[in-house]
């Protein structure tokens, strides 16, 4: 029982050694996580290994991006093939309904586009193979190398922790008194063992990274060679078809779109007949314009001066009555006397139509009611008096022997309306009779 109650010194020493080993390893992990500066000589000794690790991370990232790019490329190929096929079918359908040279061109181009769309889909086969090989490469080769790298990182952390432990033990070492010599030897043995394990894994990582890069180049060379041959064959066939279509349509007559002559120049290879037709059309339009202008000038000369001066709409129709309806209130007080004077003047003058002539036939054109001012009323009244006096003098010279001269007619004619007598505006009827 006593042998089980007390641990042997060797067992106790091994437990302490394991605890110290864990302590220094944890300290190294903490230093690496916090980014503290490590011993520059130790870091320089692992420069080759760090370069290999950068190559590995580059291979890993590029393979993942290549898989995503191939997937997107396949989707774009399918979309563009569908669009190209639809365009070819549309041109073929329109060519069946068009029997001209344009229909032949559309038919040939439509068939070429449909054929190109089918050949473009052939690129999906080498792309699918490339995607599969890259995915397999990532799942197997890169994953295996990643496992080895993780093991190497743990061995390096343990080795650097052992170096820290040996550095701490060397500070307490005194070879003259043999103080801490035994402890330093045990730490030195631990450092040697961890270094051997780290060097072995370091060599494995460097070899696997080199092999990984070579295998990736070999894989891409085979896969991309198949894709390259398929792509070149596709473009050669497509270019040959398009060249044949261009040669077949080289002799077709070009179209001259006159509606777009301001946006682009007229084609220079027009025939002489087209140029003659354009010249004749321009001359014909010029002659028609001249004839139309001459007809308008002749019609304008045949019209009387008064009819040209007055607008037509103001002399006829219901518009004239509507515009001058406001004069009814001014003419209403003398309407009965105007009718009496008209009856008396008819046998004397012999021309009842003249007395009924509208005073609006003046020299100036009438406008809307909003522009009819009192000054215009005065001008119209003067014109009416002048017209009546000229007519009376002419009739008197011709019929002086048969017709008596009316003595009271001029006064009575003044009551036909205020338009014929400007002095009557603002006076009553009695004042006018006394005057």
Swiss-Prot record:
Annotated stretches, region: Disordered: 391-435
Gene Ontology annotations for the cellular component aspect, listed alphabetically: acrosomal vesicle; Golgi apparatus
Gene Ontology biological process terms in this record: regulation of transport; spermatid development
Superkingdom: Eukaryota
Every AH domain range: 44-247
Compositionally biased tracts (Basic and acidic residues): 426-435
GO molecular function: protein domain specific binding
PANTHER family per record: ISLET CELL AUTOANTIGEN 1, ISLET CELL AUTOANTIGEN 1-LIKE PROTEIN
Protein name, per record: Islet cell autoantigen 1-like protein
Origin organism lineage: Eukaryota, Metazoa, Chordata, Craniata, Vertebrata
């Amino acid at each position: 029982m006593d042998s089980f109650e007390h641990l042997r010194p060797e067992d106790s020493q091994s437990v302490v050694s394991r605890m110290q080993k864990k302590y220094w390893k944890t300290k190294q992990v903490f230093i690496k996580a916090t980014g503290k500066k490590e011993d520059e000589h130790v870091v320089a000794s692992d420069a080759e290994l760090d370069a290999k690790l950068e190559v590995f991370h580059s291979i890993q990232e590029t393979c993942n991006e290549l898989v995503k790019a191939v997937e997107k490329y396949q989707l774009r190929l399918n979309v563009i093939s569908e669009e190209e096929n639809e365009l070819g079918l549309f041109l073929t359908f329109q060519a069946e309904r068009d029997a001209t040279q344009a229909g032949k061109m559309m038919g040939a181009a439509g068939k070429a586009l449909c054929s190109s769309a089918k050949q473009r889909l052939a690129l999906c086969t080498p792309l699918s193979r490339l995607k599969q090989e890259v995915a397999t490469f990532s799942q197997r080769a890169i994953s295996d190398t990643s496992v080895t790298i993780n093991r190497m990182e743990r061995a390096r952390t343990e080795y650097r922790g052992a170096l820290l432990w040996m550095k701490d033990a060397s500070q307490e070492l005194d070879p003259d008194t043999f103080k801490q010599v035994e402890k330093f030897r045990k730490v030195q043995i631990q450092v040697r063992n961890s270094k051997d394990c780290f060097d072995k894994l370091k060599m494995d990582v460097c070899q696997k990274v080199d092999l990984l890069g070579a295998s990736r180049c070999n894989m891409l060379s085979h896969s991309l060679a198949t894709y390259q041959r398929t792509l070149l064959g596709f473009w050669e066939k497509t270019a040959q078809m398009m060249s044949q279509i261009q040669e077949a349509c080289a002799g077709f007559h070009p179209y001259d779109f006159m509606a777009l002559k301001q946006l682009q120049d007229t084609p220079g290879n027009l025939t002489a007949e087209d140029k003659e037709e354009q010249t004749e059309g321009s001359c014909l339009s010029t002659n028609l314009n001249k004839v139309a202008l001459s007809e308008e000038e002749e019609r304008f000369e045949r019209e009387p001066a008064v009819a040209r001066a007055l607008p037509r709409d103001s002399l006829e129709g219901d518009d004239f009555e509507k515009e001058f309806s406001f004069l009814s209130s001014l003419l209403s007080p003398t309407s009965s006397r105007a009718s009496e004077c008209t009856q008396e003047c008819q046998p004397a003058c012999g021309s009842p139509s003249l007395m009924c002539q509208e005073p609006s036939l003046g020299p100036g054109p009438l406008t809307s009611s909003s522009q009819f001012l009192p000054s215009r009323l005065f001008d119209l009244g003067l014109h009416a008096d002048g017209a009546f006096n000229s007519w009376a003098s002419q009739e008197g010279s011709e019929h002086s022997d048969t017709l008596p001269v009316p003595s009271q007619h001029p006064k009575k004619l003044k009551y036909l309306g205020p338009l014929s007598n400007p002095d009557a505006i603002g006076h009553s009827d009695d004042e006018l009779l006394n005057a």
